[in-house]
């Protein structure tokens, strides 16, 4: 599987499986960095994805670029929270058929405020 094929499984989990990452090949020590949360292992990330995935109402990969084992995706997504649609960039690194690292980049100010207000 190419890095892009592995990453396609990851995005399919967001698009059609409500964040269920059980079939996604995340390395056990998968590292994720984002504006709202950071994770240092696959199981913690999977738990967050299941919770967040239940609130995602729209998720579209607008564009993807590959550079060796890195896949950069531009994503448009919406959540069942009182926030505007969001656009983000995500960089995923793949080694030996597993996603080892992810970095999500977007302006999370509105999302953090909605989460803090308990909406």
What are these regions (language model features)?
Residues 1-119:
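C-terminal and inter-domain tail/linker signature
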